[in-house]
Amino acid sequence: MAYLRSLSMISPLSLNFYGIMVLGLSVILSLIGLLGLYSAANGQFDIWAEKQGIMVLILFFIVIAFSFININVFYCYAYHIYAVTLVLLVVAEILGYTAMGAQRWLRFGFVNIQPSELMKIGLILALARYFHATKFTEIKTWKGIIFPIFLTLVPVALVLKQPNLGTATILLLVSGAIFFIAGVKIYKFALVLGGVIITGPICWNFLHDYQKQRIMTFLNPESDHLGAGYNIIQSQVAVGAGGIYGQGLLQGSQNQLDFLPEKHTDFIFTLLAEECGFIGVVLILALYMLLISMCWLISRNSNALASRIIAAGIASLLFVHIFINIGMISRSEEHTSELQSLRHIS
């Protein structure tokens, strides 16, 4: 049990400070997300903001409750949590309902659950437990990373089956960050990347038509400005219309005239960019970077590898979501409907 006692993350004083910072920043970003939903509904709470507000309140109390649970508990049950989320992915494949072209949702009463989102946490916990319990000399060998690769590829394959290319990509990127933190040699990443590049043309043939269309549209949205390229073009127009100071809450022309697509989900950050302007966007990104920094500080000050991986894994998860979402808006990354919006990240 000695290894369990070694899992305390950092000193109580530092943990309280970082914990309060993480919670406070999460609340602020959640409120900004609710404000965006309020604006997306043309000044009404009862369409999207009210439901999201209830979920934020529930999750707030869940987070408070979880803060009293010793991290050893999550370590001990890491594989169990992973197994449950994996089973939910399989159940979603069999009994789940389809939304936006993919079978990825489960209904539990009035609550809809997306198992692939739960898997992000389950995978982080499972990898943290494995690498913590494995000798560093073994991690540096190919044999030592076979099992964590298996832990990663099984849910990735199930998520791709839905199909949900965006979430599968996120799982791979976050897992890659965890492998690096755990001490896996750089040359192994290079070999994997080389394999991906070589097999890229083959993988293209296995993509769904709508996924190929998104990639081609991203490269040249003007080729179909009224069809597949409409979302990207309107998003860029909205961002540009925001200028330095923004057009003001409920004053965004793209938003109020309903030119902005999916403004309550995938393009909510575009809505905020139009109404809050460049200054507002910088402030929001600063809050996100501060939140990620707090997670990294928790990781760096942790005494055990499992604690470092859990904190760094969550930081990586946030960063990947933000990078892809902002990249989609600025057309520096391909947009997929699977990627979560600002309100989901917050």
Question: Model-found features: residue ranges?
Answer:
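Alpha-helical transmembrane segments of integral membrane proteins, especially early/N-terminal helices
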Residues: 12-21, 79-87, 237-245
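TM-adjacent membrane-interface loops and short helices in multi-pass inner/ER membrane proteins
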Residues: 217, 221-265, 276-280
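Hydrophobic alpha-helical transmembrane segments of multi-pass inner membrane proteins, especially
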Residues: 23-231, 270-330
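Short, Lys/Arg-rich, polar N-terminal cytosolic tail immediately upstream
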Residues: 1-15
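Single conserved hydrophobic/aromatic residue that forms the stacking wall/gate
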Residues: 334-346
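Conserved protein kinase catalytic core
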Residues: 39, 252, 344-346
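Nucleotide phosphate-binding site architecture
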Residues: 132, 245, 333
